[in-house]
């Protein structure tokens, strides 16, 4: 397990250090909400709680360390930060499969099931998952300001990372898949709604060096 985790950390941080790289990122999400109690139903509440799906594709070209809008590979590759350093003690299972055709390898990392609490004072992130993968940041910008979640209990049923590393040790593909289950009290213009969320969120990356 340590070998697989180290291989992933080494490859992802090497990709972040690249001065010239093209990053294709697809973000995909599906969210379903069910209402258990609602004080005053109205159209805005209904709009907020509608099931939504999204798929966005972005391509970033890093030249001499930055994109045209000043971002670096470190800003664009999840898990974010200069040093990913996913800890072995946060991983439930890690497997490496060697690709006999090209000498590369596939790494699959499975995190422990984790929980978090959200209250008006902010989010208490799961120690082994969201510290490295800000799962909620996968939501598209247009949905972030539609609700204010006043309190929530979040459960992360085993987030997974799938990574493909070529024979040269370079990260060429990566999927970050994060299922979420949550019960929450949502505020919409001072209306309180108790609801249940279930979501599957994914970031899929392809790297060209």
Q: How would you describe each model-predicted region?
A:
Residues 1-209:
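Subset-of-secretome marker
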């Amino acid at each position: 397990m340590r070998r697989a985790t180290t291989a992933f950390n080494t490859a992802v941080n090497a990709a972040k250090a690249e001065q010239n790289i093209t990053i294709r990122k697809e973000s995909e999400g599906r969210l379903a909400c069910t209402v258990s109690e609602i004080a005053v139903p109205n159209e805005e509440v209904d709009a907020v709680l509608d099931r939504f799906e999204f798929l966005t594709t972005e391509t970033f070209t890093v030249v001499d360390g930055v994109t045209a809008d000043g971002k670096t590979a470190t800003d664009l590759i999840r898990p974010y930060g200069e040093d990913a350093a996913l800890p072995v003690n946060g991983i439930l299972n890690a497997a490496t499969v060697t690709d006999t055709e090209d000498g590369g390898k596939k790494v699959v990392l499975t995190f422990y099931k984790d929980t978090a609490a959200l209250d008006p004072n902010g989010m208490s992130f799961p120690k082994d998952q969201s510290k490295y993968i800000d799962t909620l940041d996968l939501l598209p910008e247009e949905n972030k300001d539609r609700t204010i979640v006043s309190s929530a209990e979040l459960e992360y049923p085993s987030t997974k990372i799938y990574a493909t590393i070529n024979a040269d040790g370079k990260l060429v593909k990566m999927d970050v898949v994060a299922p979420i289950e949550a019960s929450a009290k949502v505020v919409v213009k001072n209306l309180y709604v108790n609801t249940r969320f279930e979501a599957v969120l994914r970031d899929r990356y392809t790297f060209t060096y």
